[in-house]
Amino acid sequence: VSRSALNVGQARRIAIAAQGFAGPPATSVTRAHLRKLISRIQVLQLDSVSVAVRAHYAPVFSRLGPYDRTLLDDAAWSHSARTPRLLIEYWAHEAALMSIQDWPLMRWRMREYQHGRWARKFVEENPHLVEEVLAAVAELGPCTAGQIEAYLEREAPGRKGPWWDRSETKWIAEALFSSGELTTDKRVGFSRHYQLAHKVIPADIYQREVSDEEAVLELTRRAVRALGLGTEADIRDYFRLAAGQIKPALAALVDAGEVEKVVVDGWNAPAYLDPGQTIPRVDRGTALLCPFDPLIFFRPRVERLFDFHYRIEIYTPAPKRQYGYYVWPFLLDGQLVGRVDLKADRAAGTLNVVGAFAEQGQDPSRIAGPLAERLRTMASWLGLERVVVGKRGDVVKPLGVALRTTR
């Protein structure tokens, strides 16, 4: 098979294989499986929406099957001599979990965010407040923005002013998170507990120096590997690099033979291929994908690979939503064949399928059986007793039948 010119089917199979959809492990999921998956996909995006399950848990389930979520919690938000912390939070894509070993690869971004990611002027103009927040965290240990604010009010009761409200304490703490001076020690519920970064990150990692150029080169290399192949725009998006960073990095990797430049039929830009990635001959991969799954989080690539137009509709008023509030694309044998609007009702013990829709040209009855199986597995994983099917969409009837007739 020529590797210099690929059709979209080949590109799609490469992308799915690179993202680790080979099938769940034969044994129960362990910390070693999690470590291997992170080294492959690099990031687990964090998001506050928990209508079905929080976003960072879902890509692990989609690739490895049911697992104990405390495995991921412990990897990200706890540390002991026996089980050292594996993951750390940072702006790796959006807010995301990434390998703690890769912290030094983000130093250039921390310098860029020296005064935070947002409200930079406010942070820049209030250096004394920055120092006070750092001193508060040093004194308190792991703490929320609210606890920092309460501490500062106690320590300086006469200093009440426009700054002393929760949101601005939060701005400062978030700015210090972005600049790498604070990090997340743990989360309780989903509330972030800040700590001084050097107290969370092992000294050998914290002190490791990586030049900006070397870091960007390595991130580009990792993005190509995680994607399998992608255009410059796809690769750039994975770690949210700038155009001025990605162009020289890709050129250097092509020159070194670490990345192959290829043409994909119908794409109007060249693609870059991981030379270690074989081209699968068979379409594989069946999974429900959360909206922030790395396979689909860059929507233009999803359209090119799958001919699948996808937009999250959380912020769309309910009457104007086409498919639903929190819609999971359904990957069946390497094709995106449908969409499922899911909601977990924990009080009732049900996983509610609010709506289920087949893509144009797809047979709803062919989708229903494998979808029922995945939904039942997901419900069990989330500790829910059953799947309840609503009324919206052309897949709900055959799905209801499939759920009743198979066990």
Tell me what each language-model feature is:
Residues V1-R407:
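Long, charged, low-complexity, helical-prone intrinsically disordered regions
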